[in-house]
Amino acid sequence: MLENPMTDPKEFFDTYCDFVTKVTSDPSLDIESLKASLEDIQNNSDIDVPRLMTAALGLSSEGGECVEIVKKMFLQGKPANEENIFHMKRELGDIMWYWVTACMALKLDPVEVILENQKKLEARYGKEFTINQSEVRAKGDL
């Protein structure tokens, strides 16, 4: 267990960094382990690894760009005007591009993904959203 960080901040961060390293997977720490993991997935599944990597990184970064606009409008005075809505439209287009890239990497039909999502949400909520159903999930509801 870590001591109070104010006692010795350098020792605290050194200890925490050691902890982080201990609980991190080999592929996250070592390029050769990462290469082996990627090659194993590429060779033993139908997943297109480079395409999925591109999609995952792109979804995260483009989603962050969209969130940044919303944050600035809601919290920092950026106007909710046509220009910023157009900016979000473009970011949403980028998100769609990466989403379809993920579908292709996983050999999934994008329409089937949307239908599966609708089926999942209908099973969870029925006809309308409730806070309880969003918080208390049935077994197997991902």
Residue ranges of each PLM-predicted region?
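Flexible "arm" and connector segments at domain edges
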Residues: M1-L92, M96-L142
